[in-house]
Amino acid sequence: MPLRPIIILPDKRLRLVARPVASVDSEVRALMDDMLETMYEAPGIGLAATQIAVDRRVIVLDVAKRRDDSAKADPICLANPEILWASEELSSYEEGCLSIPEFYEEVFRPEKVRVGYLDRDGRRREIEADGLLATCLQHEIDHLNGVLFIDHISRLKRARIIKKFEKAAKLDAQEPKRAPHSPHTDAQKPGAASDL
């Protein structure tokens, strides 16, 4: 299970709408395993395939387990997830994203959701969620639709964040390339922000 590099804003691939999975086969299960390993290593609590530049509607989450936590891992792998129902009541959570490291903003989303998806065995399932799990599901499904959490904040704050990442990308492009044996990409530096 290799670690996959996580793409960072302003990478335009983050804005693409992912294609559905035709069936959950060994290739999709291997992708899910790679995504879980990448998410745990980052560390994060959710990851969408689009964040590792894979054009498939696949997300993985584990809100119970965080790096250096004593909690037992309880991962959820979802192919073709879709929100079937969302409550009118909203709740807020300070969200972060592995593709937008070190930035956190309060985002309002439906407090409860019901999501339909295919599990690792290709069976159709539904999950009802509230709290952090509901927030995480919505955040990751947004990624599959080319939507980032910063799209849910004010235009001024969003523009400031995008400008900062565009400037950093230009500076990175001007710097000499890292040695190929470097153990970390920018997205996987120790202490990187957790993804919701």
Curated annotation (Swiss-Prot):
Which protein family is it in? Belongs to the polypeptide deformylase family.
Species of origin: Methylocella silvestris (strain DSM 15510 / CIP 108128 / LMG 27833 / NCIMB 13906 / BL2)
Q: What EC class does the entry list? A: hydrolase
> Which residues are responsible for catalysis?
E140
Q: What is this protein called?
A: Peptide deformylase
Residues passing through the membrane, by range: none
Taxonomically, the superkingdom here is Bacteria
Report residues binding Fe cation.
Answer: C97, H139, H143
Cofactor: binding details:
Binds 1 Fe(2+) ion.
- A molecular-function term among this protein's GO annotations: metal ion binding
Q: Which InterPro entries match?
A: Peptide_deformylase (IPR023635), Peptide_deformylase_sf (IPR036821)
Gene name in the database record: def
Spans annotated as Disordered: 171-196
SUPFAM superfamilies membership: Peptide deformylase (SSF56420)
Instruction: Give the UniProt keywords, A-Z.
Output: Hydrolase, Iron, Metal-binding, Protein biosynthesis
Task: Write the Enzyme Commission number(s) for this entry.
Answer: 3.5.1.88
Catalytic reaction equation(s): N-terminal N-formyl-L-methionyl-[peptide] + H2O = N-terminal L-methionyl-[peptide] + formate
Annotated Basic and acidic residues bias: 171-187
Q: Which co-factors does it depend on?
A: Fe(2+)
Briefly, what is this protein's role? Answer: Removes the formyl group from the N-terminal Met of newly synthesized proteins. Requires at least a dipeptide for an efficient rate of reaction. N-terminal L-methionine is a prerequisite for activity but the enzyme has broad specificity at other positions.
Work out whether the entry's keyword set contains Plastid. no
Biological process (GO) annotations held by this record are: co-translational protein modification; translation
